[in-house]
Amino acid sequence: MTKLRALRIGITIGLRSESESIWVNGIKQNALYLAKLFQHSPLGHSVMLVNTTTVALTDALPWDTKRFPARRFDDVKDALDVLIELGGQISDEQTRYLKARGTKLISYCCGPEYVQMIEAMIFRRVSGPVFINQQYDAIWVIPQVMETSAHFFSTLRRLPVREVPFVWDPMCLQASTRRLPFEGEYRPGGYANPRTGRRPKRLAVMEPNIDVLKFCLYPLLIAEQAFRIEGGDAIVHLHVTNADHLARHSPEFISIVKDLDIVRMGKASFVGRYDTPHFLSEHTDIVISHQWGLALNYFHFEVCWNGFAFIHNAHLCRELGYFYEGNDIETGVRQLLHAIRHHDNDWQGYRAKQRKAILRFLASNLGLISQYDELLADVCNP
């Protein structure tokens, strides 16, 4: 690795309110986890979050601002060696200012922007004019958006992209679950069926349902087929979050789900938005998930870290939970049935296995820290 010194690093965020929840989306969490990783570097980097909006920075921010200080762009623009543009975009004028003083500018791409952009175009979702910044020193792209968006980024920004490791940490999850029963961790619940000896399970589907990448329909079909096999003795209820608008206003969605047995028998509810930790703790035993082109997600780790059975098709973390390939619903059904019948036999061992598998993604992982220092060295000492 090229020799690298301690750096003054800024990571952008784009606050929309003074007390904005970190559960609104994953962007704020991403910035915090990346900041924690750089703070753990043996080189002793100085790291701060840089807000790119006009929202005031107050004590209402939902994280430890002493550990992860947040500053306005204008207050730190002369005090940075590197600015990583992650959760808020800087302007053309701000870019020129940083470049003139020698600050390195890195685009950290953690969203499927190609898909989001074409959906905005096709479905006329208003996002406003797009500023295509072509002055970056590096473009870093996390693995799950490489397939859909890497060439989109590189062509428009006129620079090759670099795939970088995904980073996560349980700190936000643990802060949210501190006062929950068992600190939000899974425990077998309910009374065992005297005929089968098994406890009936509460299923949950928690996809955002805002685009084609993470949608609830395939998980619904998995739950339906399992319900036809096991019935109400094994599946007490299915909650589908972020879906109340579909159940009320989408004729296509309504026409598909109204004839499902699990819906007809009153065993399914289509509800609004909930934060993950509380909903898992209060309403869930098993989570069913499906993604299409976004095969790593914080949600996957939050579910598995706390020991909940997780039925999913995310091939970039296939070692987690109960995996099925692609759109193979039959395998998904078999995995769900296995979890219903056997997950509680070794729920503690399962949780330990999940946490061991997630270690390679943690912000405190020494190998991961070293990889990011090498990435910084390539940018700062080309």
Each language-model region and where it sits:
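N-terminal subdomain of nucleotide-sugar transferases
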Residues: 1-51, 223-233
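A short, charged/proline- and glycine-enriched loop
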Residues: 2-15, 78-79, 194-203
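Extended catalytic core of nucleotide-activated donor transferases of GT-like folds
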Residues: 15-17, 31-150, 271-275
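Short, flexible/disordered intra-domain loops and linkers
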Residues: 17-27, 116-123, 248-251, 320-325
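Conserved catalytic-core segment of nucleotide-activated headgroup transferases in glycan assembly
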Residues: 23, 27-30, 148-151, 158-267
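Donor nucleotide-activated moiety binding/catalytic core segment of transferases
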Residues: 244-306
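Catalytic binding pocket for nucleotide-activated donors in carbohydrate/polymer assembly enzymes
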Residues: 282-362
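C-terminal alpha-helical cap of glycosyltransferases
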Residues: 359-382
